[in-house]
Design a protein with these regions (language model features):
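Noncatalytic luminal/extracellular "stalk/propeptide" segments of secretory-pathway proteins
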Residues: 66-69, 73-179
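His/Asp/Glu-rich mid-to-C-terminal helical/loop segments that flank catalytic regions of hydrolases
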Residues: 432-507, 514-515
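Soluble metallo-hydrolase cores and metallopeptidase-like ectodomains found primarily
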Residues: 148-167, 222-297, 309-312, 320
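N-terminal hydrophobic or amphipathic helices/low-complexity stretches enriched
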Residues: 21-98, 103, 108, 272-275, ...
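Extracellular/luminal Protease-associated
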Residues: 89, 138-235, 401
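Catalytic-core environment of secreted peptidases
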Residues: 62-81, 89, 104, 108-109, ...
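Short helix-loop-beta-strand segments that form the rim/entrance of peptidase-like active sites
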Residues: 84, 223-226, 312-336, 359, ...
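Metal-dependent peptidase/peptidase-like ectodomains
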Residues: 292, 318-319, 328-435, 443
Length: 515
């Protein structure tokens, strides 16, 4: 592996690009080790063996808040380009975040082997868009992630043509789709497949309408030649239009998307203890990037900062098992960093990871203490034991908790698909707090758990300090437990049937729908 000095780190993270409305991974580049220009040797003999209570006691909200203030300043460096603070992939705010994480780890001496894993990504930015359906501007229209622009980045006009079934087969597209705008129902196949089908049939653009009332935030996936400009609209507007078309009414449409698709480089940052059994590693991570719409201080500044603070405090101890920390890039664009890492592990390296713990959004203002409801029947063996560790800790603190399902929206996904036990905790995103949850956790029923999820207001005021400190202590407990021993934890096994069943149930891959 190439060794880079700390002084060369900025050059290593010189990432060029623009706001990513969509992004997709490309082939592997191996991790490269980094070394500090003033590396300090660590005397392990003087350190006590890892102890959960001691590591938890080292966590303070004051230290976390200081890191949050730095993250917000990083986001502010993007204001000139984006018009507001952001740490989105490709921005100076994200570049500064990566440098800060890596430099903080390098300053800890040789306790960790710090490395970066570089990979190219295709990202797209939508600058302007407009969709007119039957002489009315669509209020729910959202361009699909990684959509190409309309021809010549100009408006295109045509009749709306209702596609048969769900537009998953070539036979679903009537001949009169050619030169017009395809109107396609969501379901049965991926959005990208629908766009390809419409493109091959000669449509100028495609509109996919939801079967649910909600807006349709989706992605086409890796760009291919036959993709055409594609929108998603909500089910209320979609049903109204579809019913009229089904009744034989003629409706026209105007579609316009000005978008750019380009490729940049980004990195995952990794740190593994030099000490501890390298064949039995506990791994944990959060994502380093945010969305273009805001600074991303809770999502996932909170999780990535919690993981970093635990990494810093862990250096006070010696460990029996290796601990591997990760800060994933491009999570908001489809879990690309964690997918990239997990999919390219050799079989030998895969088996060394005993479990992966995902920490995404630790400080939602209207929080609930959430645990992924992993079971060994539906996830790799060990996932249930990890779930129970979180349950036992919350109970020991006299705290309530609630279970949430795996839904494919965070970085545990790639590990489960790779057969690695996984789980995690969270405090909630756009889910509405129930009355029962209000009684369990306080806050306000009827409001989002994070009212600023994926918005400009996800700033320093969008952090619940109580939840953040509590959950960071739980992260410390999870690390300390497995850094000490895997006694009673299932050994790794290959579980292809479980992995296959998991993959077939996911409609999300990251924050956006894929089908």
């Amino acid at each position: 592996m190439a060794v880079l000095s700390k002084l060369a780190l900025a050059a290593s993270f010189a990432l060029c690009g623009v706001s990513a409305a969509g992004i997709q991974q490309q082939p592997l580049t191996a991790p490269s080790s980094l070394s500090s220009s003033h590396e300090t040797a660590v005397d392990y003999s003087s350190k006590p063996l890892i102890d959960s209570e001691a590591l938890q006691n080292a966590i303070s909200i004051d230290a976390l808040v200081k890191r949050a203030e730095k993250f917000y300043k990083f986001a502010q460096t993007s204001e000139e380009e984006y018009g507001h603070p952001t740490r989105v992939i490709g921005s100076s705010g994200h570049e500064e975040t990566l440098n800060y994480i890596a430099n903080t780890l390098l300053d800890l001496g040789d306790y960790y082997n710090v490395s970066v894993q570089e990979f190219p990504v295709t990202l797209s930015n939508v600058f302007q868009f407009r969709l007119v359906l039957a002489d009315e501007v669509s209020k729910s229209a959202i361009p699909m992630g990684l959509t190409p622009p309309t021809k010549d980045k100009e408006p295109v006009h045509g009749d709306l043509v209702l596609v048969k079934n769900s537009g998953c087969n070539a036979s679903d597209y009537p001949k009169n789709v050619k030169g017009n705008i395809a109107f396609i129902r969501r379901g049965e196949c991926a959005f990208g497949d629908k766009s390809i089908g419409a493109g091959k049939a000669g449509a100028k653009a495609a509109v996919i309408f939801n079967t649910d009332p909600e807006e349709l935030h989706g992605t086409l996936g890796l760009p291919v030649e036959d993709h055409i400009a594609t929108f998603g609209i909500d089910g209320v507007e979609g049903k109204k239009i579809a019913d009229k078309l089904a009744d034989g009414e003629s409706l026209d449409a105007i579609a316009y998307i000005d978008a750019e698709v380009k490729q940049i480089q980004t990195v995952n940052v990794l740190a593994q203890t030099e000490q501890g059994d390298p064949d039995n590693c506990v791994m944990l991570g959060g994502h380093s990037d945010g969305v273009a719409e805001g600074p991303g201080i809770n999502d996932d500044g909170s999780g990535s900062m919690s993981v970093l603070e635990v990494a810093v405090q862990l250096t006070k101890f010696k460990v029996n098992n290796c601990v591997r920390f990760a800060w994933w890039a491009a999570e908001e664009e489809g879990l690309l960093g964690s997918d990239f890492y997990a999919e390219n592990l050799s079989e030998e390296e895969n088996q060394k990871i005993r479990l992966f713990m995902d920490y995404d959004m630790m400080a939602s203002p209207n929080f609930a203490y959430q645990i992924y409801n992993a079971t060994n029947a539906e996830s790799p063996a060990g996932s249930e034991e990890l779930r129970n560790l979180y349950v036992d800790w919350y109970k020991s603190q006299g705290l309530n908790y609630t279970f949430i399902p795996f839904d494919g929206r965070s970085d545990y996904d790639g590990f489960i698909r790779a057969g690695i036990p996984a789980g995690g905790i969270a405090t909630g995103a756009e889910a509405v707090k129930t009355k029962e949850e209000e009684e369990m956790f306080g806050g306000h029923a009827g409001q989002w758990l994070d009212p600023c999820y994926h918005q400009l207001c996800d700033d320093l005021g969008n952090l619940n300090h109580t939840a953040w400190e509590v959950n960071t202590k739980l992260i410390a407990h999870s690390v300390a437990t497995f850094a000490l021993s895997f006694e009673g934890f299932p050994k790794r096994e290959v579980e292809s049937e479980t992995i296959s069943a998991y993959g077939q149930t996911m409609k999300h891959h990251g924050p956006k729908l894929i089908l």
